[in-house]
Amino acid sequence: SDAVANGVHAISGVVDS
């Protein structure tokens, strides 16, 4: 996603764990 997950900026389209 484009949202910050686990303090790491995830790439859009990738599922945030």
Curated annotation (Swiss-Prot):
The keyword Secreted applies. Belongs to the Frog skin active peptide (FSAP) family. Septenin subfamily. It comes from the Eukaryota. Signal peptide: none annotated. The keyword Secreted applies. This is Septenin 1b. GO terms for cellular component: extracellular region. May act as an antimicrobial peptide. It comes from Osteopilus septentrionalis (Cuban treefrog). Keywords: Secreted. It is found in: Secreted. Expressed in skin glands.
